[in-house]
Amino acid sequence: MGESWAARGAEGAPARMPLVLTALWAAVVVLELAYVMVLGPGPPPLGPLARALQLALAAYQLLNLLGNVVLFLRSDPSIRGVMLAGRGLGQGWAYCYQCQSQVPPRSGHCSACRVCILRRDHHCRLLGCCVGFHNYRPFLCLLLHSAGVLLHISVLLGPALSALLQAHSALYTVALLLLPWLMLLTGKVSLAQFALAFVVDTCVAGALLCGAGLLFHGMLLLRGQTTWEWARGHHCYDLGTCHNLQAALGPRWALVWFWPFLASPLPGDGISFQTPGDVGLVTS
């Protein structure tokens, strides 16, 4: 669907740096997860059946996570390659002087991507790309499975961290959780203990952030709003819960959360949008 993220000429190395840093952090988390799954440090030890189930769950979560990342980055949410000439006659159309093109309703120009985005929601700093009409579904699924993976890792590492903390004072516990780098530099913890505390801290914080993002965008999804429309109190495209879900996730909206490559084509084109009057709905 359009140009891939890596092939977009407008984005140089600085724009890709957030994705590189995110990928490095994700690699560290995956390695830590693999370490826990294989060696199972800390009490209680995992039995063969529990280990197999944990491995299956971890593999499923990682496949969903990586699959949605690939779909997100391969989907071009911009107006590139979209035939807009002669279509800017309806209500809500505007002219973008940066792109030198008519743009449809709900579109917005991104200074980072340097192009207008169809049904623009926001620019995702962690992935270095805008969230728009064509990649909103993988973005939502990415939030869900990111929170799940990070929470899973936190639970797996919990016993090992708990055993470490119980062997020391309360002050040591607070310092290790809040200032792991300082504890490492002062020689109060080993490198392995620092890595354990740092990864747990990062995963818990990441899970909370992803969970909060999922709740917020879930609210927008049910209301048929973008972040820009929510901030300004616009409800022009709220078609009701069921129609809003289908408009953003396709007809199989209830199943797309479980597998990233499930076919669920979007009913729209990102250029024209239905309003409550178009579908005969009455909004309060």
Swiss-Prot record:
<comment type="similarity">
    <text>Belongs to the DHHC palmitoyltransferase family.</text>
</comment>
<feature type="domain" description="DHHC">
    <location>
        <begin position="94"/>
        <end position="144"/>
    </location>
</feature>
<protein>
    <recommendedName>
        <fullName>Probable palmitoyltransferase ZDHHC24</fullName>
        <ecNumber>2.3.1.225</ecNumber>
    </recommendedName>
</protein>
<keyword id="KW-0449">Lipoprotein</keyword>
<dbReference type="GO" id="GO:0016020">
    <property type="term" value="C:membrane"/>
</dbReference>
<dbReference type="GO" id="GO:0019706">
    <property type="term" value="F:protein-cysteine S-palmitoyltransferase activity"/>
</dbReference>
<feature type="active site" description="S-palmitoyl cysteine intermediate">
    <location>
        <position position="124"/>
    </location>
</feature>
<keyword id="KW-0564">Palmitate</keyword>
<feature type="topological domain" description="Extracellular">
    <location>
        <begin position="159"/>
        <end position="166"/>
    </location>
</feature>
<keyword id="KW-0472">Membrane</keyword>
<feature type="transmembrane region" description="Helical">
    <location>
        <begin position="19"/>
        <end position="39"/>
    </location>
</feature>
<keyword id="KW-0012">Acyltransferase</keyword>
<comment type="function">
    <text>Probable palmitoyltransferase that could catalyze the addition of palmitate onto various protein substrates.</text>
</comment>
<feature type="transmembrane region" description="Helical">
    <location>
        <begin position="53"/>
        <end position="73"/>
    </location>
</feature>
<keyword id="KW-0808">Transferase</keyword>
<feature type="topological domain" description="Extracellular">
    <location>
        <begin position="217"/>
        <end position="284"/>
    </location>
</feature>
<dbReference type="InterPro" id="IPR001594">
    <property type="entry name" value="Palmitoyltrfase_DHHC"/>
</dbReference>
<dbReference type="InterPro" id="IPR039859">
    <property type="entry name" value="PFA4/ZDH16/20/ERF2-like"/>
</dbReference>
<keyword id="KW-0812">Transmembrane</keyword>
<feature type="topological domain" description="Cytoplasmic">
    <location>
        <begin position="188"/>
        <end position="195"/>
    </location>
</feature>
<feature type="topological domain" description="Cytoplasmic">
    <location>
        <begin position="74"/>
        <end position="137"/>
    </location>
</feature>
<feature type="transmembrane region" description="Helical">
    <location>
        <begin position="196"/>
        <end position="216"/>
    </location>
</feature>
<feature type="transmembrane region" description="Helical">
    <location>
        <begin position="138"/>
        <end position="158"/>
    </location>
</feature>
<feature type="transmembrane region" description="Helical">
    <location>
        <begin position="167"/>
        <end position="187"/>
    </location>
</feature>
<feature type="topological domain" description="Extracellular">
    <location>
        <begin position="40"/>
        <end position="52"/>
    </location>
</feature>
<feature type="topological domain" description="Cytoplasmic">
    <location>
        <begin position="1"/>
        <end position="18"/>
    </location>
</feature>
<keyword id="KW-1133">Transmembrane helix</keyword>
<dbReference type="Pfam" id="PF01529">
    <property type="entry name" value="DHHC"/>
</dbReference>
